[in-house]
């Protein structure tokens, strides 16, 4: 009887180690949905002096997001190299960090450091999001936490910081040298890692030992930076679903083999993650790629049988979030609302009052919106949080800042136990309702509906979207107007800038330089390391660039013309930058 009671207590103890409903254990929280199970009491307003519970200093920046399990928050960072363009330092000094912070006090409980596995891709000078040094969000199963550091591998620690194992998943480089950013997820006894840049692979690792259980290689992973999601098909089947370049894939998470695929959006890159509603999955991509809804399940090519709708709504880097029958996505300072039943655009709201983060506000939309109860929270790159009340029409409640200092926010916030956690380039912040009155910096909401003027049917794209076709940079050729001046012709810097600025937002990003053979030299014009080149930076630096003989392009860029890009977008058999010849898709399950 006594022995039986001990086993009962032990079983209960082990059960409590699992992730609770109010935890935020992975990128975008429970099931990767971006929807908080708890946290209803998270305040709608705060300031650096009100409703700020604590802030914790971080050892360096990162584009990863925080997670919260129990009373502990975890976040990854990097230091030692690539912090500034003027003085990047020595790559041998690059270190990744996993930091654990007490959720009650903000005290750092422990920090684990991982030295870079060399050779590592060098800092490009265009910002933290362009190299992947700390872009993957860790995942926790309630017992251990697993962090992916690109070429430096996957590392497992217990919740007290004890290192358990490390596993390599690849040491290759994607042609753009951007690195990967897909975050690991956990399933049964496995950690599943998408090593798109490191080995064009999806890898299943044993959570207890780090042993590789399966690996599927596919060059179709090139140009994919989103995180896969687990979709329950029925009681006996769960699919691992991801959006890659121009396709949706449904894999068997037990072995990585492909169960089904569907033609998806027109984008040659997939930055954001899918969202789901039961078995129905939604993907929204950028670069004029559009959006799609597909019912997961089946086998083989399910494009004709399972596609529910296609639409013109587009994203940039942030992933969409679903609430009831609506999808919400933020791109370039505009919040778009999409009907989940039809794919039609319901509303477009321009976010007003936002501050610039080096470049134009709205361009650095890396954080994804989240849902807490009946409110939508969106954090921009300058650390301003827009809070909306959800309903038939969106109503902006507040616009908040957590710091007056100049810090950059690239991670998606986490919500757990009535607390909201944000990471910046310097600190981890925790906001909770302390009963303090806040004079919110609210901004009026501009209704910028374009439902009548913008085509939203299949194949349409919203006004201002990038035109498709062989002439644009993503097809492999240089963007129109982006070639170097020919001999004997007058050189107009703004004409060149306008040709590179495909989305006409007044800035040139790394994505817009993709396929341009001068990309690496043009990136040096980004003097403030904000991930984009402004008109001022371009006009100031371009003449000097040409006078130094800058017309010779990078060997990583496309050769120009009809689709000769070497960036390895993973679609249509592009050059793989001397990588092994791999299949386009994972092995099909029989």
Predicted segment positions?
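Acidic Ca2+-chelating loop motifs
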Residues: 502-513, 528-538
